[in-house]
């Protein structure tokens, strides 16, 4: 008898990863979905509380992995409370070198230990933030690398890769999770409850939300 397929979601408690979680639950069933959350020294630590609450509320197993050692070898505005968030060249200073590679590697190690092949991550290159590790070419490359490194058939899914934020809100609505995601998820880089309305992450989220609500109101 074949084992029941399962999935693991790289989960921050934000809009994108929570949308992926609802997608995974819809396809695999709540009892067959887990989430992995990373503590990497992020200044918006409130997201860890949100992730914990959402996982408990939806009844999915959460594994917390501490990768904060990365603070000893790199610096950026996402991990420095005193840094001003700004664009530096083509890449914003909120970019954490190696973060998504690290997340995927650790998640894959965990997934294999649990007999899980499907990994969801909410990366997206449409509303491009300038993060090189959010590009489809990187994810595909990492998928091949992990399969070779562990001799295992991982399937990394990126359902939001080519969606705008407006389309991501629309997807949440289709999943019956619009109000839940709007109310309970955290996106703000500065860690402000309800959003600061000024950081790039808040502005992108609010722009997409307003565009979707305007479109929905005109239908």
From Swiss-Prot:
Query: Which EC class heads this enzyme's classification?
Result: ligase
The record, for SUPFAM superfamilies, names: Adenine nucleotide alpha hydrolases-like
Q: Which domain of life is it from?
A: Bacteria
Which biological process annotations from GO are given for this protein? queuosine biosynthetic process
Q: Which UniProt keywords apply?
A: ATP-binding, Ligase, Metal-binding, Nucleotide-binding, Queuosine biosynthesis, Zinc
Q: What is its EC number?
A: 6.3.4.20
Q: Any idea what this protein is called?
A: 7-cyano-7-deazaguanine synthase
Q: Which organism is it from?
A: Glaesserella parasuis serovar 5 (strain SH0165)
């Amino acid at each position: 008898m074949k084992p029941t397929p399962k999935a693991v979601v790289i989960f921050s408690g934000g809009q994108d990863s929570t949308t992926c979680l609802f997608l995974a639950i819809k396809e695999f069933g709540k009892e067959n979905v887990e989430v992995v959350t990373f503590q990497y020294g992020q200044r918006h630590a409130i997201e860890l509380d949100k992730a914990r609450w959402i996982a408990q509320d939806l009844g999915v197993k959460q594994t917390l992995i501490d990768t904060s050692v990365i603070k000893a070898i790199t610096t950026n505005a996402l991990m420095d409370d005193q840094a001003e968030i700004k664009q530096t060249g083509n890449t914003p200073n909120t970019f954490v070198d190696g973060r998504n590679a690290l997340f995927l590697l650790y998640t894959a190690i965990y997934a294999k230990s649990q007999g899980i092949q499907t990994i969801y991550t909410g990366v997206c290159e449409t509303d491009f933030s300038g993060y090189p590790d959010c590009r489809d070419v990187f994810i595909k490359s990492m998928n091949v690398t992990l399969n070779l490194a562990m001799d295992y058939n991982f399937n990394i899914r990126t359902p939001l890769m080519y969606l705008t934020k407006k389309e991501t809100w629309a997807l949440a609505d289709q999943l019956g999770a619009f109000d839940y995601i709007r109310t309970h998820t955290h996106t703000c880089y500065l860690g402000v409850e309800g959003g600061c309305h000024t950081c790039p992450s808040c502005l992108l989220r609010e722009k997409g939300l307003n565009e979707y609500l305007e479109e929905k109101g005109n239908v």
